[in-house]
């Protein structure tokens, strides 16, 4: 699960954590071993540790050093290794998909086993062509497969970081707008009180002059 390292980003971390709880609820009773969670982002680590039915796993130190591309690759390699060794049956990633500055969608996608995306059907002309692969298809797949997982993991990370910054900008903009509105209301209240004080002083002066 990808989250934020810092706060001041609205409900960003909370929504990611809720998505994790929904996922755990789906798995409840369906798996015997605990669900292994790799939390990338300091803000959710303590909450996840207190969550029932999960085992929090360490992530590469590269993330703390802000070497994000290398960290994503190292994490992907760790997940691939555990999957091939049958330590885990399935790997899913929870992250914030960046759609636009005002829209970030909390998503959950399957990383392993990798399912290729559907492509458009080939025309008869293309389908009848014969291709010779060198080296063979199996060797090509063994080389490309990790690269696809690496790039996909890095994409999840970048989208989540972009969504985090967008949420932070929007939160700060809302806070700024609320502060400006509050200042205007306070200024209006101050002007009213000032006018009341001036009126009271004038009434005292006029009353004193009449006497």
Language model features with spans:
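C-terminal beta-strand-loop-alpha-helix "lid" module of Rossmann-like NAD(P)-dependent dehydrogenases
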Residues: 1-211
């Amino acid at each position: 699960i990808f989250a934020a390292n810092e706060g001041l980003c609205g409900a960003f971390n909370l929504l990611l954590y809720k998505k994790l709880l929904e996922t755990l609820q789906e798995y409840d009773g369906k798996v015997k071993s605990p669900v292994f969670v790799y939390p990338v982002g300091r803000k959710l680590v303590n909450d996840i540790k207190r969550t029932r039915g999960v085992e929090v796993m360490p992530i590469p130190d590269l993330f703390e050093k802000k070497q994000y591309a290398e960290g994503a690759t190292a994490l992907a390699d760790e997940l691939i290794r555990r999957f091939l060794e049958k330590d885990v049956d399935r790997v899913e990633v929870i992250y914030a998909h960046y759609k636009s500055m005002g829209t970030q969608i909390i998503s959950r996608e399957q990383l392993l086993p990798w399912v290729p995306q559907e492509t458009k059907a080939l025309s008869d002309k293309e389908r009848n062509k014969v291709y010779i692969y060198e080296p063979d298809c199996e060797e090509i797949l063994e080389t490309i497969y990790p690269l696809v997982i690496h790039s996909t993991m890095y994409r999840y990370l970048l989208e989540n970081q972009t969504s985090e910054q967008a949420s932070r900008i929007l939160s700060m903009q809302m806070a700024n707008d609320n502060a400006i509105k509050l200042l205007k209301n306070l200024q209006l209240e101050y002007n009213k009180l000032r006018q009341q004080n001036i009126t009271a002083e004038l009434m005292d002066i006029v009353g004193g002059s009449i006497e």
